[in-house]
Structure formats: C-alpha cells, structure tokens
Amino acid sequence: MDGTPGHDDMPGQPAPSRGESLWAHAEGSISEDVILAGARERATDIGAGAVTPAVGALLCLLAKLSGGKAVAEVGTGAGVSGLWLLSGMRDDGVLTTIDIEPEHLRLARQAFAEAGIGPSRTRLISGRAQEVLTRLADASYDLVFIDADPIDQPDYVAEGVRLLRSGGVIVVHRAALGGRAGDPGARDAEVIAVREAARLIAEDERLTPALVPLGDGVLAAVRD
C-alpha cells in the first residue's frame, strides 16, 4: 500500500462510471504525430474545433474501409480531421474540404503541406457549405464527413447522402451535443436540428446507421 487515495477515498470525487472509463480509455489510446499535434495546436489558437484523436482514428478507418478515393468534408477547421481522413485514403485519393473561414483553409493547407500531401490530393473550397454541396456530383463520393454548425446538420445530411456512391459512408460529428441530444428535456434549436439529422438518417431505407460514443458523438451510416 502506498497510501495514495483511490477514487472511493477522495472526498467529493466519485468514481467514474463504466461508460466514462471506457470513453476515457478510447480517447487516451490514440497518439498523434508531430504534424497532427501542430495542426491541433493551431486549431486551439484560433478557436477552431478539432476532432479528438479517437474520432480521427475512426475517420482514418472509415476512409480506408470505404475505398477512400473521393472524400468530402464539411468544416475544414485547421486541417486536423483532414489529415486523419487523408491517412486512410488511397494514394491517389482526393479530399474536397469546405469552410467559410479563409484562415481555416490557410492553416489546413499549411498542415497538408507539412505532412507532404501534394496539392493534387486536396481541393479546398471557400464558401457556404449549403451552396457548395449542391454543386458536387451525385453518387461520386466514398465518404462524406460533416463537422460543422449543428443547426445546419439536416441540410448537410440531405446533401451528403445524395453525394454517396453505393457502399459510401456518411459521418456526422457532434451527434451527441455533450449528451443534450439524448436528454428528453432539451429542446433548444441545436438539439432539435441534431435530432432531425439523426431522424433523416434513421428513416432512410438506403442507410445502415450506428452511433459511436467517441468525441461529441459520431453518427455513421453506410449506403446500400
């Protein structure tokens, strides 16, 4: 015995639940290289959101499983999620990433260059995602990743499903909203929008969905 108090011995510090322990283990099990760490630091500096390492690893896996030749991303941030997606894509795969903030796109371009990713492998588009997505071709993407304002999730989901080829995957981050999405008493605009996006996916007979408890909730679905 070393005399160090455990969770049960520390006043005011209840032991974490099993779910909390599993989440902490999953989130702490993934390490990032110096390129990703730098992109994450820049994202923090400018207040841009970034997926957790565990969500990033999931994106890499899904990009690889889906074929990873053509991927679309809504919400570039500083390039953290883009780096993870590209790491799972084919060597000739192209990431199309959309953000309304020029500074986000600049930092993402910097991150991709630092990772040795050539300009032919990325297409960075500045603009409102609702408008840009309508210009992308039907059934042309292996994966569509949505990590943007929860209010707009229903619009992005509708367009994202249209973009998927057969066997393609749509991935929606911030599907839990810190647990509020599953709280029957929560009825604010963000919660309503996130629930509507989840309903659109659940009721689409072409999709097979699953909700993954990583980051702020990841809703993924594969198209038949």
UniProtKB/Swiss-Prot annotation:
Textual note on the cofactor: Does not seem to have metal cofactors; no metal ions were found via inductively coupled plasma atomic emission spectroscopy, and the residues that bind metal in homologs are not conserved.
Database matches in Gene3D superfamilies: Vaccinia Virus protein VP39
Spans annotated as Disordered: 1-21
Stated family: Belongs to the class I-like SAM-binding methyltransferase superfamily. Cation-dependent O-methyltransferase family.
Pfam families for this protein: Methyltransf_3
Origin superkingdom: Bacteria
Coiled coil: none
Composition skew (Basic and acidic residues), residue ranges: 1-10
Name of the protein in question: Probable O-methyltransferase Rv1220c
Lineage, uppermost ranks: Bacteria, Bacillati, Actinomycetota, Actinomycetes, Mycobacteriales
GO cellular component: peptidoglycan-based cell wall; plasma membrane
Binding partners and assembly: Homodimer.
Positions that bind S-adenosyl-L-methionine: 51, 75, 80-81, 99-100, 104, 129-130, 147, 156
CDD domains given in the database record: AdoMet_MTases
Keywords assigned: Methyltransferase, S-adenosyl-L-methionine, Transferase
SUPFAM superfamilies named in the record: S-adenosyl-L-methionine-dependent methyltransferases
GO molecular function terms noted in the UniProt entry: O-methyltransferase activity; S-adenosylmethionine-dependent methyltransferase activity
Biological processes per GO annotation: methylation
